[in-house]
């Protein structure tokens, strides 16, 4: 992501879109990159039309999202202070996995966000990840455990 911060002005939108999506998906903690601020990340994502960030399947999901969108985020002690991050998921089970990885007893949060503030949808790692402008997250709260027998979709 640091590379893109400096090269974005000379890249075509197509190249920037492909490289940004690839770098975002491959970086372990893109929300906590010390070299690229949230403001800079948001500017990078906003500088590229969404269809250039996603493959056709991802863009189809992106276009079909409800408005507003319910999103989830799993946090551990490592990132507990970074709830209002760019990276959320559409899938509560994925958020649950992130909240409990590394043997942690983390927390799953849920929020609502107007669709226009979702900058991309990525499913390259089967995480149903949405990149959001976090200042537009609404009704952030701890997500209640699903009742037994309920199936999360």
Q: What label would you give each PLM region?
A:
Residues 1-71, 76-86, 90-153:
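Conserved NAD+-utilizing ADP-ribose enzyme module
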């Amino acid at each position: 992501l640091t590379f893109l911060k400096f090269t974005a002005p000379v890249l075509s939108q197509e190249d920037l879109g492909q490289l940004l999506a690839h770098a975002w998906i491959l970086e372990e903690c893109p929300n906590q990159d010390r070299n690229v601020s949230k403001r800079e990340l948001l500017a990078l994502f906003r500088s590229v039309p969404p269809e250039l960030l996603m493959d056709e399947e991802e863009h189809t999901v992106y276009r079909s999202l409800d408005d507003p969108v319910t999103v989830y985020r799993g946090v551990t002690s490592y990132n507990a202070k970074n709830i209002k991050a760019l990276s959320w998921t559409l899938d509560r089970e994925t958020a649950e996995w992130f909240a409990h990885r590394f043997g942690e007893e983390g927390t799953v949060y849920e929020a609502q966000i107007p669709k226009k503030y979702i900058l991309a949808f990525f499913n390259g790692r089967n995480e149903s990840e949405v990149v959001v402008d976090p200042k537009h997250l609404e009704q952030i709260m701890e997500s209640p455990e699903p009742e037994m027998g309920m199936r999360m979709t």
